[in-house]
């Protein structure tokens, strides 16, 4: 038989106050008094119980019912695990800015939810869902734990995933950019240029076999009779500094041949351009560079970056409409909606 702790970690059962009290070694009455703020509980015991309640995401049934029946007008935004800051992840800054505008226009506030360690007994995401503090969730994470998906479905939390595909479930609403088609367009375009070597710069937290951008790029090159060599896939963290270092570490590749480079995103592409400039590689004569997303910085720097423009405003607006419809009780079948990126040619390509 599973222990209470094991059942709770699986995320399938809502814990009663009796079970919680048994798990942490105090009486049910003490749990109730402590979490209701009664002065009869000593400070040390109250702090211990509150700490354990936070650890396990436990709330009293009376608190949960009150929160459940009260609309909070707050939407949680679940950020990726690799998220560092809005200043370094400018695509998320761009999306988040549009999201704030859309939700504010509809009189909703935002709560950012971010987990450093999703494998802990009850992570922030799960605790917030169980607490009833949110009317719904917007997700930016490409992966959820199975216990998290089970919890969303069990509690019927209005949930919409934006920008990234959730690999684990076809039962959730997903709105995303067609990254494979974007990669295909870039591959087909560069495949028609006077290029001897094709390069793809990937991110280190996305396995190549799961990269829609890479798959599309390879298909686009193949449509032009060209091939991406196995030794032409570079990997870096999601930052311009890491992309710069990756190019410098493989400098011979760019100095010997005419290259066509597809970089995972615009910020990394700016790092690639800095490295090429330092190596004396002329852009676009000796190296042509494509980014992805068309963040505002892509057109502000010199040379201006060629990229794929993601229809962020439309995607975010549709996502907010869908989420609020779910919150208001509309029966909407789970679906996946793809948005097509548009090629924007600037100074880094011919």
Where are these regions (language model features)?
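Flexible loop/turn connectors
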Residues: 248-350
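Short, well-structured alpha-helical segments in soluble
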Residues: 121-133, 243-256
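Short acidic/polar active-site loop segments enriched in Thr and Asp
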Residues: 27, 73, 134-135, 195-198, ...
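Flexible loop/hinge segments that line or gate small-molecule binding clefts
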Residues: 140-185, 267, 293-305
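Amphipathic helical "hinge" segments at domain boundaries
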Residues: 59-124
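Hinge/beta->alpha junction and helix N-cap segments in small-molecule ligand-binding domains
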Residues: 81-94, 112-120, 175-185, 201-248, ...
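N-terminal helix-turn-helix DNA-binding module of bacterial transcription factors
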Residues: 1-73, 350
């Amino acid at each position: 038989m599973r222990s209470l702790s094991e059942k709770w970690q699986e995320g399938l059962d809502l814990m009663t106050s009796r079970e919680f009290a048994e798990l942490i070694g105090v009486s049910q009455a003490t749990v109730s008094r402590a979490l209701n703020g009664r002065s009869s509980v000593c400070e040390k015991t109250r702090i211990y119980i509150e700490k354990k309640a936070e650890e396990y995401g436990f709330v009293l049934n009376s608190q949960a019912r009150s929160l459940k029946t009260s609309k909070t007008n707050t939407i949680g935004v679940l950020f990726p695990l690799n998220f560092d800051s809005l200043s370094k992840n400018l695509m998320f800054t761009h999306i988040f800015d549009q999201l704030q505008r859309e939700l504010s226009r509809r009189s909703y506030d935002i709560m950012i939810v971010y987990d450093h360690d999703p494998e802990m007994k009850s992570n922030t995401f799960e605790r917030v869902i169980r607490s009833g503090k949110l009317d719904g969730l917007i997700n930016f994470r490409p992966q959820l734990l199975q216990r998290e998906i089970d919890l969303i479905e069990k509690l019927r939390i209005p949930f919409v995933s934006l920008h990234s595909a959730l690999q684990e479930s076809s039962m959730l609403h997903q709105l995303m950019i067609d990254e494979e088609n974007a990669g295909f367009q870039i591959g087909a375009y560069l495949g028609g240029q006077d290029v001897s070597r094709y390069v793809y710069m990937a991110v280190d937290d996305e396995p190549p076999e799961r990269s829609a951008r890479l798959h599309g790029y390879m298909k686009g090159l193949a449509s032009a009779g060209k091939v991406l060599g196995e030794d032409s896939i570079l990997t870096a963290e999601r930052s311009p500094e890491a992309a710069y270092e990756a190019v410098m570490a493989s400098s011979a590749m760019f100095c010997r041949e005419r290259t066509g480079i597809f970089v995972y995103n615009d910020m990394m592409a700016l790092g690639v351009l800095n490295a090429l400039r330092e190596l004396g590689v002329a852009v676009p004569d000796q190296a042509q560079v494509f980014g992805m997303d068309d963040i505002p910085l892509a057109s502000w720097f010199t040379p201006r970056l060629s990229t794929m423009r993601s229809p962020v405003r439309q995607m975010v607006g549709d996502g907010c409409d869908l989420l609020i419809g779910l919150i208001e009780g509309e029966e909407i079948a789970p679906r996946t909606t793809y948005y097509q990126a548009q090629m924007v040619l600037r100074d880094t390509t011919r």
